A protein has these predicted regions:
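N-terminal loops that bind phosphate or other acidic moieties
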Residues: 1-133, 137-372
Length: 372
């Protein structure tokens, strides 16, 4: 099919391939079968880790800043800038990747560095900031972030409370008067695939605390501490969608920074220029490491497929592992999915050989959809 124009808009395969590498491998596989096929690549992300990399691949400039990591030590964090729009990924400053293997600090990990990263974007002239939240090592309700931006959180003796979510149980006063005045003049968009509230059975500690090393006792402590924190800052916002994102940093951004919440993939498709790229395509290839129930709830492939289906463009997906029945794929707008596990059932081998296997999957797509 000489007129075929393929848009590759896939997320990363976590632990094996970045979104950029996925696009490269899919392109190579397609061209092995149809050398002249026109392929446009647009690596995507949903606001979690990989969001800055996707923006850079779309033409944003990569910037770096030295900030405070989740354990209090300095780390280098990247953000992306194009004109007056910045893409800031909280995981770059406060993510799990900054913790040594097996080391967690569920009660004391801080988002202070995320606030410093926002300051760097402000200093670079950003007036619109897309704040991607996900992959955090923290459950501090965004208190660390707000402290870096000029807020003060004091105990009953007028002393600053310690870092992390646990010490918020001692909070007596929250003073937001020192927040950087530039924050009042920007559009801060909270981009997340998580719409959980701050606390309760579906809140940040209960749903995500365990993956950050929290014990059952820690979860109870954090939930109570964040509820107390919210009672002082503003209890109404604690129930808003996205308040529980990234250990509650969503709440801090909503209650104190005037942020507006949008599903991460919707924001990123806008920022990355997906609509004009889609208009040029006759076939879309999306995907991520695992296509499962979570995919259907705000993950990148679901967002890409929904937009493509609305435009009447056929969508196929690539993945490492497929855990959705055909009817669920069809409902999501995905015509067919190609899983690396079908080519190599051993998960360890499949991850290690993800690149070559993905090229083989793309060859199959070319035979099935470009030469039919």
């Amino acid at each position: 099919m000489e007129t075929a124009r393929v848009l590759v808009a896939a997320d990363k395969f976590k632990g094996s391939l970045t979104a950029v590498q996925v696009a490269e491998r899919v392109t190579a596989g397609l061209r092995r079968v149809v050398p002249g096929v026109r392929v446009e690549t647009l690596p995507v992300a949903d606001g979690g880790d990989g969001t800055v990399a996707a923006a850079v691949a779309a033409g944003f400039e990569r910037r770096e800043a030295r900030v405070t990591g989740p354990l209090g030590d300095p780390v280098t964090a990247a953000y992306a800038l194009r004109g007056s729009t910045a893409v800031v990924e909280m995981a770059e400053a406060s993510g799990l990747q900054h913790l040594p293997d097996g080391v967690f600090a569920p009660l004391t990990a801080t988002t202070y560095g995320s606030g410093e990263l926002l300051l760097a974007a402000l200093g670079a002239g950003a007036t619109t900031i897309v704040f991607g939240v996900g992959g955090s090592a923290t459950t501090d309700g965004g208190a660390g972030m707000l402290a870096a931006l000029g807020a003060r959180f004091l105990d009953a003796d007028g002393k600053p409370v310690g870092p992390g979510g646990g010490p918020l149980a001692e909070l007596a006063e929250a003073d937001l008067s020192g927040l950087d005045p530039r924050l009042a003049d920007i559009d801060l968009v909270l981009a997340s695939d998580v719409d959980n509230p701050l606390t309760g059975p579906k809140g940040a500690p209960e749903v995500y605390g365990r993956q950050k090393g929290a014990s059952e006792e820690d979860i109870a402590v954090l939930d109570a501490a964040l509820a107390h924190y919210a009672s002082i800052l503003g209890p109404d916002q604690a129930a808003l969608p996205g308040a529980g994102a990234a250990g509650g940093i969503g709440y801090g951004a909503l209650v104190a920074l005037g942020a507006r919440f949008r599903p991460g993939i919707e924001v990123m498709l806008d920022v990355l220029g997906f609509a004009p790229a889609l208009a040029r395509a006759t076939l879309v290839i999306t995907g991520e490491g695992s296509l499962d129930e979570q995919t259907l709830h705000g993950k990148a492939p679901a967002g890409v497929a929904a937009a493509a289906r609305a435009a009447g463009i056929e969508v196929v997906a690539v993945c490492g592992r497929l855990a959705l029945p055909p009817e669920a794929l069809e409902k999501a707008g995905i015509r067919r999915a190609y899983a690396l596990a079908e080519l190599e059932p051993d998960p360890a081998v499949s991850m290690a050989q993800a690149g070559p296997l993905l090229e083989r999957a793309a060859e199959s797509i070319a035979w099935d959809f470009l030469l039919r």
